[in-house]
RNA sequence: GUCCCCAUCGUCUAGCUGGCCUAGGACACCACCCUUUCAAGGUGGCGACACGGGUUCGAAUCCCGUUGGGGACGCCA
């Protein structure tokens, strides 16, 4: 049994797409489960659309997700010698030939075939020529692969079983351009061969490329690898997921406050399941994931479920883990956690009440920055006649507490409620608005403990003064 | 147009080795409980086997057809 070797082979024409990330995830999990090797290859033969920025975005996305690779990244543009060698092998064996057709001729051919309601395909004009034809000759000929004309090819797929394609449906695909550079279907075969890839896991939009590639493997004298074509991810309109459906870049989800493990959890469940279990850790997934259990049908991306999973992972994580991911969001808001309560402690109070890190950062600002104003509705509802006396009472009691902890603070609040003959909410809510500026915060005792005695006393006094000046 | 893939609640899914399915779970939505707030949690509700035919004592499950959806048909990947 040879070692399993898989690969992720993105084209650097943009960011790391959600769909690509899911493909990478399935390959990565399959590899890790079986103790294999995960190869990263950058397919950049499209010189016009590939950019270094896109390469960096892909590498950054992979790193953020934690999808580490064992080999590479290999760049296809650095392997042209290898492709040339294999091209020459096919030419020498008569398995490939030069095609002198002009682009104009091919375009006309395609248009005529479509007018006849036929499948557009190369008509084989140069297939058996010894040299250039007498007319309509391209300046630089391309190289085409000599596809068998009869019979069929079977794709054995780990997810779909055997899928059969008639050779008469295929045509002689271009494997090298006029400038000599190879095209995708050729490079992918050569690379997977030379990199010893044993399992190709990719989107099922490539299922129809596979019969051509199997012919190429066989022409080069090799057995094809195992294939698993995983279903697409669709947008809400049922089409392939794209920008018009919202965020589709992995790093965009990072920026919107998602944890990498939450996104991975969501993506793995979009097509794979393990009974009714919904929440998985990455280590757990490595143990459980089985490529043969991936579903056949495409799934629709649903941000609502992803948000819930993010909430589940936030709640279950160690506070220091969340604190590390939260720090950059506070920095973006001009906040230095060193100037206030320990961020880990803040996270502990907020973990059950935020679906994203963006939300958690926004809701935690008041710990580090005195609110400049009170929410109008919250103030109107909770700052009433009599509130100033309650706040000043609490302020005084807070100042005299022997120790500043949640239990002592809770005692002050319940004592004040008794002293003023009101329910606890009539004390807690004004305190909440006073220190946070809003009607929402963690439990008031924990909130005030974190804020500190000095800052609490100052904010409560300030609010009492505001009430005297603005209420009644 | 040709070929390939696919079809269970609004979304993700369990179930597909016929009987255990008056099809279960999660998310979302609605209601109630808990509760100083927001959440979390608990309980309940709403909600699906695309349609037709066949095989069978019996079909979500097997077969055929229709319908609908996705993909490929680039000198992109």
Swiss-Prot record:
Q: Where in the cell is it found?
A: Cytoplasm
The cofactor binding remark recorded in the entry reads:
Binds 1 zinc ion per subunit.
- Start and end residues of each stretch annotated as Disordered: 112-137
Q: Which domain of life is it from?
A: Bacteria
SUPFAM superfamilies assigned to the protein according to its UniProt record, in alphabetical order: An anticodon-binding domain of class I aminoacyl-tRNA synthetases, Nucleotidylyl transferase
A Gene Ontology molecular function term for this protein is:
ATP binding
> Which catalysed reactions does the entry list for this protein?
tRNA(Glu) + L-glutamate + ATP = L-glutamyl-tRNA(Glu) + AMP + diphosphate
> Does this entry carry the keyword Transmembrane?
no
Q: Where does Zn(2+) bind?
A: 99, 101, 126, 128
* Matching Gene3D superfamilies: 1.10.10.350, HUPs
**Which Enzyme Commission number(s) are on file for it?**
6.1.1.17
What are the UniProt keywords, alphabetically? Answer: Aminoacyl-tRNA synthetase, ATP-binding, Cytoplasm, Ligase, Metal-binding, Nucleotide-binding, Protein biosynthesis, Zinc
Q: CDD domains per the record?
A: GluRS_core
Q: What biological process terms from GO does the record include?
A: glutamyl-tRNA aminoacylation
One Pfam family here: tRNA-synt_1c
Motif span ('KMSKS' region)? 240-244
Give the GO cellular component terms, alphabetically: cytosol
Motif 'HIGH' region: list the residue ranges: 10-20
- Report the family membership: Belongs to the class-I aminoacyl-tRNA synthetase family. Glutamate--tRNA ligase type 1 subfamily.
Q: Provide the function of this protein.
A: Catalyzes the attachment of glutamate to tRNA(Glu) in a two-step reaction: glutamate is first activated by ATP to form Glu-AMP and then transferred to the acceptor end of tRNA(Glu).
* Record text on subunit structure and interactions: Monomer.
Q: What is this protein called?
A: Glutamate--tRNA ligase 2
| The organism of origin for this protein | Halorhodospira halophila (strain DSM 244 / SL1)
């Amino acid at each position: 049994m040879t070692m399993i070797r898989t690969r992720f082979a993105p084209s650097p024409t943009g960011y790391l797409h959600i769909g690509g990330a899911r493909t990478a995830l399935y390959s990565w999990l399959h590899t890790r489960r079986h103790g294999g090797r995960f190869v990263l290859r950058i397919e950049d033969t499209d010189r016009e659309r590939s950019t270094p920025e896109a390469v960096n975005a892909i590498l950054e996305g992979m790193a953020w997700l934690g999808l580490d690779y064992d080999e590479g990244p290999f760049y296809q543009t650095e392997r042209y010698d290898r492709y040339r060698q294999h091209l020459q092998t096919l030419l020498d064996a008569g398995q490939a030939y030069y095609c002198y057709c002009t682009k104009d001729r091919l375009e006309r051919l395609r248009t005529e075939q479509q007018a006849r309601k036929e499948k557009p395909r190369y008509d084989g004009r140069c297939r058996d020529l010894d040299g250039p034809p007498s007319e309509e000759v391209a300046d630089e000929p391309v190289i085409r692969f000599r596809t068998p004309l009869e019979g069929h090819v079977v794709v054995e797929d780990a997810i779909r079983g055997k899928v059969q394609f008639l050779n008469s449906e295929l045509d002689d695909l271009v494997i090298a351009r006029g400038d000599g550079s190879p095209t995708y279907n050729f490079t992918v075969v050569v690379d997977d061969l030379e990199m010893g890839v044993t399992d190709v896991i990719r989107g099922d939009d490539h299922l129809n490329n596979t019969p051509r590639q199997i012919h190429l493997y066989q022409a080069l004298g090799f057995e094809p690898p195992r294939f698993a074509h995983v279903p697409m991810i669709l947008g809400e309109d049922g089409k392939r997921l794209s920008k018009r459906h919202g965020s589709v870049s992995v790093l965009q989800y990072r920026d919107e406050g998602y944890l990498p493990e939450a996104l991975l959890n969501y993506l793995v469940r979009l097509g794979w399941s393990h009974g009714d279990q919904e929440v998985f850790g990455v280590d757990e997934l490595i143990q459980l994931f089985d490529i043969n259990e991936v579903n056949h049908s495409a799934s629709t991306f649903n941000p609502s479920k992803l948000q819930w999973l993010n909430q589940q992972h936030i709640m279950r994580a160690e506070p220091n883990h969340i604190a590390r991911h939260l720090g950059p969001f506070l920095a973006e808001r001009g906040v230095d956690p060193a100037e206030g309560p320990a961020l880990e402690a803040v996270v502990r109070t907020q973990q059950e009440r935020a679906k994203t890190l963006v939300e958690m950062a926004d809701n935690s600002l008041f710990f580090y920055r005195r609110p400049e104003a009170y929410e109008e509705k919250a103030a109107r509802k909770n700052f009433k006649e009599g509130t100033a006396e309650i706040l000043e009472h609490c302020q005084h009691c807070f100042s005299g507490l022997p120790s500043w902890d949640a239990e002592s603070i809770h005692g002050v609040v319940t004592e004040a409620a008794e002293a003023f003959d009101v329910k606890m909410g009539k004390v807690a809510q004004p305190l909440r608005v006073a220190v946070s500026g809003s009607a929402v915060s963690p439990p008031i005792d924990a909130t005030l403990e974190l804020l500190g005695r000095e800052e609490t006393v100052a904010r409560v006094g300030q609010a009492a003064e505001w009430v005297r000046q603005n209420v009644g």
